[in-house]
Swiss-Prot record:
This is Uncharacterized protein R865. It comes from Acanthamoeba polyphaga mimivirus (APMV). It comes from the Viruses. Residues 330-368 are annotated as: Disordered. Residues 336-368 have a biased composition (Acidic residues). Belongs to the mimivirus L5 family.
Amino acid sequence: MDTIEPIKICKKMYYSADELKEKCPIFFKGYRNSWSLINADVVDEQCYIFAKYEDGKWIKSTSQSKKFNKVFLLDYWVESNIPEFNSNLEYEITQAPDILKLKNSEKFKDDKGNIIDIEVRGNKNDSECYFLVKDVASGFYIKRLFSILLNFNSGYEIKTHYVYFNIIKQKNDKTIVKKELFLTHLGFVRLIHRSRINNVKYKKTVHRWLSQFKSKTPEKFVLNIEKMSKESRIGFTYLVSSPLLNAVKIGAWRSTLISLRSRYITGYGEDLSLFAIKTADAFALEKKCHKHFTKHKLTNELYDKQHYNEYVIFPKKNKEDYDIELESDIDKSESDIDDSESDIDSENDIDSESDIDDSETDDEEELENPIKTLSSFQYCKNEATDIFGNIKIISDTVDFYLCVSDVEKLIGNKNNYNQDSLIFVKKNYGKELYIKYVGLLEFVFTTNSTKESIVKLRKWMCNTLNTVQMGTKSQKNQLIASMTGVSPEAIKAVFSKTSSTLPCIYFFTIGKVKDLRKSLKISKDYDDEDIIGKYGMTKDLDRRTGEHNDTYGQLPGSDFRLTVFNFIDVQYMSQAETDLKLYMKDTILI
């Protein structure tokens, strides 16, 4: 705030209320002018005066003429009540941080190259950056984002996941203060985790974009928002019932059929009946069903069981075709299922020859790879991870799985887990429920639980990721040492020098496009801030570094340096190089 000097009137010091309104607009929000502040009895009578300007100085006036007089506030009152003058005070809703200006290469783009502008304020720091909610809602087609965030039952918490700021703008030579809602970095991460768009590539792109607020490395962030929007609506409109319930529930589901059955099996029993039909917009078809069968409605989403066959016919006739290429992670193996009850008699029996019988094994997902029980699992041990010592862990060649009965004793109830992450594993004594490791991570980061074990585990995970991504060399060495049991000095020695050759895969950065565009004849399709790199495999990293430095390091504008490398066993060198090439192609980096 620019300094405002008090004025001496009748041996006392006063501040001009008009100047204060201009320099402290948040304090004056809701008051059209300084006179309305007085009329609202905000200022004690002895703490303000009216004054007029005569003969080059301000003189106290006894009249209240708005035409000739101005309002002045006593300096003591101003310095005791206005936050701009008192560091011990702060507004309930503070002024928004400055806008963080992003380069075009740091912004989202749709698949047509159009920029999706999201106002970001603060600094490139995950605890100090904020995203304007109305821009996120518009850019990502989330119409109900405001109501989702502010819904008491949604799990989003003010100051943790979202905040209010006052935005100060100039309009028609007037200063306007407007309250706006912003997502925090953590709130944005939570929003993506809980999104109904089950597209891994989409979520990864958003996560990479958010990661730039911890790192200054520019990347391209291209999203096909229109495609994602259509994809997010593909799903199943379903009917579920059972002998235990004298009603039929009509609903919509965006995930797999296995998880849908798992959702109801506890309440409805093993012999529940499930009919599901895949459509382009599962929730729209669900609404049509609710509207069409209003006369059969019992309560909420439950309907009279006698009309079951009508409920089956209607969605079959009203389903919309969908583009198979738009399917993401929902069940692609079957389009519809029907395991409807055989004891329902009707003149209009359903011909289910095109439907698929939902066999007994559909309520369980089994590990296809050989299972290995990790009885002596060597996890990174500390106060936060000690709970893993009390959890039965198994693995196949793809993933780790944790016994749910052990997990829920320590950190939470299984009803809070993502049902897609739960699997059944056959044992000699029957079936046992396990949760995938990624499912456990999702639970830890999205739960509202304040249980000490969860809070400790989440804090340790965040600190570890921050060190990996943003830590100094010393901090990273300390982290490696804590995981391997080797001293940081030994880690530093191994990575700084060695007397033998180092078979490895590597990645060198050569420089930015803007510095190399001329020497490498790079087209304008690439942004100035894009990074040029060279990857490969070698039996001797020291020799290869020298060779590349003699070529790429001598290019005009080059800033040649080794960015990352990874040791590999000599017998796997060729395979490692092939895997690296495939990875680069899959991630569209070459």
